[in-house]
Amino acid sequence: MGPRMALPRVLLLLFLHLLLLGCRSHPLGGAGLASELPGIQELLDRLRDRVSELQAERTDLEPLRQDRGLTEAWEAREAAPTGVLGPRSSIFQVLRGIRSPKTMRDSGCFGRRLDRIGSLSGLGCNVLRRY
C-alpha cells in the first residue's frame, strides 16, 4: 500500500467515523426538556387565561356596540331637518344625475360611450370638457 492509496483511505475512514457520530439517537425526553416543561406549561396557562378574558370582554361589549349604533342612527334621523334637501331627496338626485358624466347628452357625432371616450382623448365632434 503506497502513500497515494493510504491518504484517501484514511480520509474515508475519518469521514465515516464523523458521519456515524452524528447518527446517534436523540430522545425527546431528555433532561433539558424536563427543566423547560414547567415554564412552557405556565406560559400556556397564562395564554388560556388571557384568551378567556378577551372573549369575556368581547361578549360584554357586543350588546353595547349594537345599542350605541341604533341610538346614533335614531338620533341622526331625528336631528335631520325635514325641509332641507338631504342626500336621498329626489330633487337632489336629479341635480346630481345631470352633473354626472354618465348621463352626459350625446354629442351629435358619436353615441354615449364614444362621447365618453372622446372626452378623454379629444376625439369626436362637439367635445366639451366638463372636468
From Swiss-Prot:
Species annotation: Sus scrofa (Pig)
Record-given protein name: Natriuretic peptides B
Top-rank lineage group of the source organism: Eukaryota
Disulfide bonds: 109-125
GO molecular function, one term: hormone activity
Any GO CC annotation of this UniProt entry: extracellular space
Signal peptide: 1-25
Any one Pfam family match given in the protein's UniProt record, by short name: ANP
Keyword annotations from UniProtKB, A to Z: Disulfide bond, Hormone, Secreted, Signal, Vasoactive
GO biological process annotation, one example: protein folding
Main location: secreted
PANTHER family in the cross-refs: ATRIAL NATRIURETIC FACTOR PRECURSOR (PTHR14066), NATRIURETIC PEPTIDES B (PTHR14066:SF10)
